[in-house]
Swiss-Prot record:
Post-translational modification: Transiently phosphorylated on a His residue during the reaction cycle. Phosphorylation strongly increases the affinity for substrates and increases the rate of nicotinate D-ribonucleotide production. Dephosphorylation regenerates the low-affinity form of the enzyme, leading to product release.
EC number: 6.3.4.21
Disulfide linkage: none
Name used for this protein in its record: Nicotinate phosphoribosyltransferase
Organism: Acinetobacter baumannii (strain ACICU)
Record family assignment: Belongs to the NAPRTase family.
UniProt catalytic activity: nicotinate + 5-phospho-alpha-D-ribose 1-diphosphate + ATP + H2O = nicotinate beta-D-ribonucleotide + ADP + phosphate + diphosphate
Recorded metabolic or biological pathway in which this protein acts: Cofactor biosynthesis; NAD(+) biosynthesis; nicotinate D-ribonucleotide from nicotinate: step 1/1
Pfam families named among the record's database cross-references: NAPRTase (PF04095), NAPRTase_N (PF17767)
């Protein structure tokens, strides 16, 4: 079977930006990540059928190392430190830290346990492998043709949006955030190249570092939930974990990579911690769950209360978007904020087949549970309901959904 992952750059930029902070600030952290498929009822065949192929792909993944040209590319990114690239030169994923099996209920189970500087780098690779293995068994020429038809329709739609823009209108900016849910690497590259070549004034870049390198476009990304969640188990009061995470980020990047993620314990709790200091230091906020209009209006009110000009701040939306949703949000917020959009599944896996809704999330750090309390029912995730209840209590969050 041919390898699915050919390069350790075939992952999202924020894996590198988060790993650099972990390596510099808390390198001894131990972590556990757990796989979930949120729509098992929609699968054409049982996911467990890919288990043997998955294990073979993991064996290959753990043989990969960074090539010299890849390291040189990373060195050119101004926020990547030279000692971090030196670490990556020695880096290799260790097979003993990841286990794929069938759980007691007959579902595909993937568990990663080991040093966070190792464990956190598996996620995007594994999700991309699971997707490609699953869809390769139901691939037909008709599927690719339908994907191409939908891609061309998207490009035509963006060109219509461009024509409707007035000369002084703020730009409509879209990025590819679809590595983890892609149909295949080949398809993602095709989509990203098509957007880059056809609508270069709209297409801002891709989260995929390998594609950014190969196509000479901007790699996009800052932080994910796992970075903030880890601080729930580090040496700070639980009530202060968000402030500690944001402060650590600021100390590492000194003004670079300034988009903060708001929904680890919900937007309201985030804004209570996002004081004048952070509001001035960070360039903006990323939306990843809950009603995006309500969220953006809350951000607007918060910045206004702090007497900050919202036109100097960026709102990035990345939750289950397609182009019409993004365009409507752009119209709503464009006169108050700079706005950008990260589109994932709808760009890289819109083929007429039901995409897998799969995640591989941090559930434990240093022997202690961590959790995400999303602004969307169903996206909350933990392996420990007792800790989840305590976290809700500490941050005064009503129970709207159950952890999955």
């Amino acid at each position: 079977m041919s390898p699915i992952i050919h390069s350790l750059l075939d992952t999202d930029l924020y894996k590198f930006t988060m790993l650099q902070v972990v390596l510099h600030k808390f390198p001894q952290t131990h972590s556990v990540y757990h796989f979930r498929c949120r729509n098992l009822e929609d699968t054409v065949y049982p996911l467990v059928d890919i288990l043997d192929d998955l294990n073979e792909q993991l064996d290959h993944l753990c043989n990969l190392k960074y090539k010299e040209d890849e390291l040189q590319y990373l060195r050119k990114l101004r926020f990547i430190k030279s000692d971090f690239v030196d670490y990556l030169e020695l880096f290799q994923l260790k097979r003993r830290f990841i286990h794929a099996s069938i759980d007691e209920e007959g579902r595909l189970d993937i568990r990663i346990e080991g040093p966070m500087v190792q464990a956190m780098m598996f996620e995007i690779f594994v999700l991309a492998i699971v997707n490609e293995l699953y869809f390769s068994r139901i691939k037909t020429d008709e599927v690719w043709a339908e994907g191409e038809r939908r891609l061309q329709a998207k490009l035509e739609l963006i060109q219509q949006y461009e024509k409707s823009q007035q000369p002084n209108d703020p730009p409509f900016l879209v990025s590819d955030f679809g590595t983890r849910r892609r149909y295949s690497f080949e398809w993602q590259k095709h989509v990203v190249a098509a957007f880059h070549n056809t609508v270069p004034n709209v297409f801002r870049g891709t989260s995929n570092v390998l594609l950014a390198k190969e196509l000479n476009i901007t790699p996009i990304g800052t932080m994910a939930h796992e970075f903030l969640q880890a601080f729930q188990a580090l040496d700070v009061r639980l009530r202060d974990f968000q402030k500690a995470a944001l402060e650590t980020w600021v100390q590492e990047y000194r003004g670079d990579l300034g988009i903060a993620l708001t929904d680890v314990v919900g937007m309201d709790a985030f804004l209570r911690d996002f004081d004048l200091y952070f509001a001035k230091l960070f360039d903006g906020l990323r939306h990843d769950s809950g009603d995006p209009y309500e969220w953006g209006d809350k951000a607007y009110a918060h910045y206004r209360k702090l007497k900050i000009d919202t036109k100097t701040k960026m709102l990035t939306f990345s939750d289950g978007l397609n182009l019409p949703k993004a365009w409507e949000l752009h119209q709503y917020f464009k006169d108050r904020f700079q706005v950008s959009f990260g589109i994932g599944t709808n760009l890289t896996n819109d083929m007429g087949q039901t995409p897998l809704n799969i995640v591989l999330k941090l559930v434990e750090c240093n022997g202690q549970s961590v959790a995400k309390i999303s602004d969307s029912p169903g996206k909350t995730m933990t392996d420990n309901d007792t800790f989840l209840a305590y976290l809700r209590q500490v941050f005064q969050i009503e129970e709207l959904d159950e952890a999955i």
